Amino acid sequence: MFTDWKEHTSHVKKSFGELGKQYPKMLQAYQALGAAAAEGNVLDAKTRELIALAVAVTTRCESCISAHAEEAVKAGASEAEVAAALATAIALNAGAAYTYSLRALEAYSVQKA
């Protein structure tokens, strides 16, 4: 497993800041996108972070996992809620693999014909 998630999260935030110094408009746009997604308060912070954590798993983004795990804790998510969100991500990834397997079989059949 990863050595130190808190250290990793700190490193990610520092790295974002460093890149943001070189490309401030890009960082501002990225931050604005996050703010726009939260606009309207339809989803509370905890729900948004549970979704973000599940998406981070499906996109295999370790930095996203680190940052959104921290935010999920801050938003008051329980371990059971995090586990349920992750179980949903696992099920969705399995579904994607299943449907892409059907496409692979179709491609094989077409290539064989």
Swiss-Prot record:
Q: Name one Pfam family in it.
A: CMD
SUPFAM superfamilies noted in UniProt: AhpD-like (SSF69118)
Q: Which InterPro entries match?
A: AhpD-like (IPR029032), AhpD_core (IPR004675), CMD-like (IPR003779)
Top-level division of the source organism's lineage: Bacteria
Instruction: Report the GO molecular function annotations.
Output: oxidoreductase activity; peroxiredoxin activity
Protein known as? Uncharacterized protein HI_1053
